[in-house]
Amino acid sequence: MATDGASCEPDFSRASEDAAEATAEATAEAAKKEFDVDTLSKSELRMLLSVMEGELEARDLVIEALRARRKEVFIQERYGRFNLNDPFLALQRDYEAGAREKEKKPVCTNPLSILEAVMAHCRKMQERMSTQLAAAESRQKKLEMEKLQLQALEQEHKKLAARLEEERGKNKHVVLMLVKECKQLSGKVIEEAQKVEEVMAQLEEEKKRTNELEEELSTEKRRSTEMEAQMEKQLSEFDTEREQLRAKLNREEAHTTDLKEEIDKMKKMIEQLKRGNDSKPSLSLPRKVKDRRLVSVSVGTEGPVTRSVACQTDLVVESTDHVKKLPLTVPVKPSAGSPLVSASAKGNVVRPSVDRQASHGDLILSSVPTVPPPSVNKTEENGPSTGSTPDLPSSTPPLPNNTAPPAVQPPSIASQNYSQASSLHSLHSPCANASLHPGVNPRIQAVRFRFQGNANDQDQNGNTTQSPPSRDVSPTSRDNLVAKQLARNTVTQALSRFTGPQVGASARPGAPTTGDISTHPPVGRTSLKTSGVARVDRGNPPPIPPKKPGLSQTPSPPHPQLKVIMDSSRASNAGAKVDKTVASPPTSLPQGNRVINEENLPKSSSPQLPPKPSIDLTVAPAGCAVSALATSQVGAWRAETPGLNQPACSDSSLVIPTTIAFCSSINPVSASSCRPGASDSLLVTASGWSPSLTPLLMSGGPAPLAGRPTLLQQAAAQGNVTLLSMLLNEEGLDINYSCEDGHSALYSAAKNGHTDCVRLLLNAEAQVNAADKNGFTPLCAAAAQGHDKCVELLIAYRANINHAADGGQTPLYLACKNGNKECIKLLLEAGTDRSVKTRDGWTPVHAAVDTGNVDSLKLLMYHRAPACGDRLNEEEPESDVFDLDGGGERPEGTVKPVVPADLINHADREGWTAAHIAASKGFKNCLEILCQHGGLEPERNDKCNRTVHDVATDDCKHLLENLNALKIPLRISMSETQRDSFGSDDFECENTIWALTIRRQTSWDDFSKGVIQALTNHFQAISSDGWWSLEDVTFNNTTESSIGLGASSVLSIMLGSVSWSPGQSFAQSPWDFLKKNKAEQVTVLLSGPQEGCLSSVTYASMIPLPMLQNYLRLVEQYHNVIFHGPEGSLQDYIAHQLALCMKHRQMAVGFSCEIVRAEVDAAFCKEQLVDLFIRNACLIPVKQSPGNKKVIVILENLEKSSLSELLGDFLAPLENRSTESPCTFQKGNGTSECYYFHENCFLMGTIAKACLQGSDLLVQQHFRWVQLRWDGEPMQGLLQRFLRRKAVNKFRGKLSSPRDPVCKTVDWALSVWRQLNSCLARLGTPEALLGPKYFLSCPVVPGHAQATVKWMSKLWNAVIAPRVQEAILSKASVKRQPGLGQTNAKKHPSQGQQAVVKAALSILLNKAVLHGCPLPRAELDQYIAEFKGGSFPLSIVSSYSSCGKKKGENGAWRKVSTSPRKKSGRFPSPTWSKPDLSDEGIKNKTVSQLNCNRNASLSRQKCLENDLSLTLNLDQRLSLGSDDEADLVKELQSMCSSKSESDISKIADSRDDLRRFDSSRNSPAFSATVNNPRMPVSQKEVSPLSSHQTTECSNSKLKTELGVSRVKSFLPVPRSKVAQCSQNTRRSSSSSNTRQIEINNNSKDEIWNLRKNEQVEKPNK
């Protein structure tokens, strides 16, 4: 039929079109795989849009043409045989068609169906195109926005460019002006520089001239001084000769008179002889001759003018009886003078005698004192006159020190003394004075200073020889020395007469005489020495002379008249009685011995006056006052220490007036007995008297007081002891007055080295620590100038030896700076601080080295301060003082430096130590001394990173390079057990941590400190967060590091093969010991499990010691502990080391212990475990009692077996270890018996799995779980510490900066491990997580980072890539049909799964491994090919998502898929879930953790067991619509698009996992869930482990974990249980001992997504 034939044509054409469409679709599919829309440019997108529009138009035209063509063909075929002319045929056709309607097939295919099919296809294409156009349009909009922003930025750029040009123009103009000004200024600078040079040249010339003038002036001054001395000497000689001649003249006149009388007598005798009697003249002549002889030695002539008679010669034998009663009488002149008190009212010191062999100034009295009645005042007129008989000249040599002290002679033997003294009539007493007229020659006044020093040498304690000036000298011996002494006394008295007012005053009453006993009596004779004037009782008072009224503005107050006991038989020559106290002379004791005996205080009947600040002694107007120089104590030797020492003689008593109150101890001063041979001119040589002071002394009246402070300073600066003592005796004078520069009198005296002036000022209570304007004290000045005597004196008066000036200079620093060895020694013996630093950071060591003074440096380093401040015997040599002179001869190491290493290594502002200074200046000797100190650090850098060797001269460099030092490596050794259990490839058996420097002088204490410090610094360095070497941690004083290791962790130290412990000392020094034993290294052994400690385990594994101790406590306390974590987390090592430690602890207390290790595999069954427990006595029969044996069972690799099957029957007996909870086990012979676990059994297990799932959760609550998370301690920092320890070992304890390639390589390996685990956790593949064990074998090779990259490629290909591939395939197929489908998926993955695996490997490789590699990019490209998956193109990941979408996904679904998503796990078995019914949801993006109580957990477990079978049936019945491959690709896309991986701590462990259910109508439970907007479909599951970093977990609670995927479960949850769990969750508190429940993110989003899904599915119904 034609209709049939026509109907076949459309079929054929349709088939061809279908084939063409299929071909086009196949081509399009192939093109899509290679075509990436995301990578097209703007022009390419436009071209694509135009092509697509043209294609649509062409399709529309083709459709219209096909419609028209088919319509014509159909009409022709249908109605071609009919026409309108025959209606009957049409009726017949209609009839036939109606009749055969049911039988007849259609003539051709319905065009409408074809069009509908075409339109449906076009609609699909249009939808796809619309989506691409929408995406392109959005990108185009973004592009336009960016264009607008770019234009705005360009406009701003143009504006800024214009401004910049303007500013450039302005700046250019300014720069040109500045350049011109700079040129002008440079010219001016040059001119000024030339002028300055000229001025400097002139200045230099002037300086030279000034220096020449100064030299000439100094020479002239010296010449004038010499000439003046010569003139004074000549004047003194002239005066002496004049006095001698005058005395000779007087004697000759007297002799002439005698001769005249004799002539007269002879004439009379001749006359008488002429007259007759021949016998009488022969008898009278001898008698007269005898009389003449006696008269020649009798008392001198007494003229009618002179009423005061002084005994000048030996008394006549025929004297009256009153002479015997008063053997020591002093004549008095009532009309001209007043009696003078012999001693001051404040005199209280028994002064030791003076032993001066070469001086003539000691005046010795030999007299017999009488004891008057108590009512009589014991006084002397005119002082203790030396005119008493007998007299001893000063030239008499002193007795030896061992001479016995003379005894006091009673008055009964006075006649004997007089008779003995008569034999010395030829020795003239030096107290006779020639008469002087009031108008004294000024030359005599000027020479007074010269005479005073020698005249007063007679009695340093103030005794003077005075007589009335009007009395002539009686004839005595013609000795020149006596004449010279007489002349000096005459000048002194004359000057005293003319310098004082002619006013008489009485002596102060109540002042008894204190006596000092001379040690120089004549042969067999007794001599008494009267005491000197007293000293002011004012702190440490000086020996002050009697106050001269001529120097005071106010006269001394009047005193009661002195009572004098007169003899009636001799009224004109009556003298006061003198009572002298005799004391035994000190012959062997040091100076300064004082006796205070207040029991012997005499009672005075005179009225008592209060003490005054100074001593006022009235003087006779005739000039009988005590001279000021009589007590100046020139050249006196001070006592060693001010204070009370032992008395001179216990039998001697000291007379002290009761009116005197003592405030402090007094340092007695006397002439030096330690320096025999001191010259008489000590005052002149020590005082430095200047002629400029002469006019003051030449003036007759008193000087004004206004200029006295300045005069005091001048006297102290010039060393004028005379003037200084006179000034100090005045009242109202400020002795602490300082001039403009702040210099006090004490400062000036100390600076110029005037020891006597310093002593006077100190006794006068001058401020010893007064500082000038620069902060320098007198001690500083004396130490800087090198005046050791002044320094010694100031130190004795408690000067501040550590006083620092404004610049920080101490006296020790100044002494070292100027190289004053004696001052340094004195200061060090006084205990000064050697470590005081100046403002510039210099110490005394710097100062000593800077001057190159070897002796000063040796003193600083080796001189020890004495244990006691007072050296009782100064002559004994100090055995521990470093010998400065023989330092080179002493054996090295015999003297230990006293300065610490910190002081030797102290750096100044520039970072220079003393060694830097010595080396740079070429002071080789100083550098050698510094190098002898064991603590010197020659490698210390300054601020410019220069060592001592860098700045040293050639000689010093040679010295540094050849130092006597041993460099011995310090190592920490690992035990064999730790190496075997840990893996010998992972770490070296010995780690070198430092190189010890041992020198000859190193002591065992220094060696111990060095070893302990090196260990402490090493432990701190490897446990720190950054890279820093041992030099950087010396300031850290913490005893333990963050990993818990310290000095207490050391078990023993091996010096070669000899064991040594810190603090132990051998007879030999460390240098000799190590040399002798040939020790090449020092090995440290840490306390390990064998000693019941875990320190060695901590160092081997880098797990902090507190955590290991906590693990050990858990095992000992709970008995059942399981260590779990990712593979490679050292679970087996930790369990084994803890077991070893427990074993040795138990054995130490007397128990036997055994460790049983069992490796669990898939074939390990429960029966084998029962047999293991019974065989090792862990399970014992109920009837049997437990023994004392301890058993530790370690079950390794429990992840290879099912925990519920293996340990299910042991849970209750293990938790309750008693006979009350037994378990029954069947033996091999068929019988059964009850067993129980005893308390002496410990069970530890290890699981290399990050989380538990399924039925294994039932075991969880019965054990204590220790979780070893990769992102928490101890695993988080373990790899870092381990690799850092490797680097320390390679560099022998010295680490470079973080920029060093080795440090970068170690940091890269560490980041690879962290980033890899972070990415794997983000992908939801916890089974692929790696512990740090695989990375411990990372090679650390300095300078060869390629080795580390090669090692990383091997690790990637052998371990990481296979684990990642397996985990990705497991995740991609986890929701497929369990059983065969999953197995086939792993063995034969589909193309999509292979693409996902390759993409995951490529992304992990680029994001985690290659990122941060220290190699350059060009070099790194050579190694990329060695990594598996490195060549996979990432563009396929983007195109993969377009063909992976399911039907019905629209724009809304895509919006949902970009939200945070929960990754699904690979585990087929379900876990319990807890939904969140809260409307608000969880706002926090991170995981919230809530705790359920024990009841809720138990109810869940019971529900889990009841509904287990129902869950499996539901899983088989449900058709899951989500595609995990697409989800993985989304995650990979997000990871690939992120520029940098976020911090692992901020990555959420899960995202919302949204699923659609196409067959929800077949599941009533889930259709109800969908319709209920408050009930989410996908349940939130419980993660099995806690996310806390705590390692102590509860036995009875479930745990959750961050960073791992969850297991899907679709169990129908009753509302009541859900509500109960929700309420319990809200009530519970967060705790590590409760179950951790993981709640997902916002539930509102999930509900909204499900409602959208429902709307999408409605049109399909």
From Swiss-Prot:
The modification Asymmetric dimethylarginine is found at R497. Residues 1643-1661 have a biased composition (Basic and acidic residues). It comes from Loxodonta africana. Residues 1-27, 206-226, 329-438, 454-477, 493-612, 876-896, 1444-1480, 1555-1597, 1614-1661 are annotated as: Disordered. The keyword Zinc does not apply. Interacts with CTTN/cortactin SH3 domain. Interacts with STRN, STRN4/zinedin and MOB4/phocein; this interactions mediate the association with the STRIPAK core complex and may regulate dendritic spine distribution of the STRIPAK complex in hippocampal neurons. Activation of glutamate receptors weakens the interaction with STRN and STRN4. Regulates the dendritic spine distribution of CTTN/cortactin in hippocampal neurons, and thus controls dendritic spinogenesis and dendritic spine maintenance. Associates with the striatin-interacting phosphatase and kinase (STRIPAK) core complex to regulate dendritic spine distribution of the STRIPAK complex in hippocampal neurons. It is found in: Cytoplasm, Cell cortex; Cell projection, Dendritic spine. Residues 412-426, 467-477, 1580-1597 have a biased composition (Polar residues). ANK repeats lie at residues 707-737, 741-770, 774-803, 807-836, 840-869, 910-940. Gene3D superfamilies: Ankyrin repeat-containing domain (1.25.40.20). It comes from the Eukaryota. This is Cortactin-binding protein 2. Residues 383-394, 454-466, 1622-1636 have a biased composition (Low complexity). The modification Phosphoserine is found at S1522. InterPro entries: Ankyrin_rpt, Ankyrin_rpt-contain_sf, Cortactin-Actin_Reg, Cortactin-binding_p2_N.
